[in-house]
Amino acid sequence: QISEYKPEWLMLQPSSADLLCNYIIEHNIDIPDSVRYIEFSGELLTDRVRRLTKDVFRCSIANQYGTNEVETIAYECPHGAMHIMNSNVYVEIVDDIGRNVSGTGEGNIVVTSKTNKVMPFIRYKIGDKGCLNVHKCDCGNKAPILELTSARPSDFVITKGGDKVSPYIFVSIFNVINNTLDGTIKQFYVEQSDIDKFK
């Protein structure tokens, strides 16, 4: 589909990009040169996946860090630093009992939403670990830099053949169904009861 549609911009989860790039390499698929920019979000982006994606697509790459609850927390600048979106969230690094970690020490990332007036998230622990760096960045952005050190692992659907498939495949399936049902499905839940059975 990428070859047919010829997109200029892709938004991917690192785990999905890893699977996609390896599939492209294994099947010797030609990637159109229309892809000029790839944005990552949703998971911890490792150096390996970044290099792999850049080698396969040969385009600019940026990383966005956020959650469904508070949206964007930090965004990568051209110099590779993840600057906190101060207008959207307040970020703290705390220990396991909620005390602020001093300096650039590692701890649990907690966020407070500055924009959600209906259901505010205050010191929301998102399950990731990191540290704050306040050194001056050459890009000119004065916002603190968030360094993510560990993140929650992503779930995969394991097929009978042992392949790993992103669970977001179900989102695509239900989007197709909803297009024919005029958006009747508002929520869905999928459970893998056996290696080849879903309900």
Name these PLM-found stretches:
Residues 1-199:
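Active-site glycine/GP-rich loop and adjacent strand/helix microenvironment
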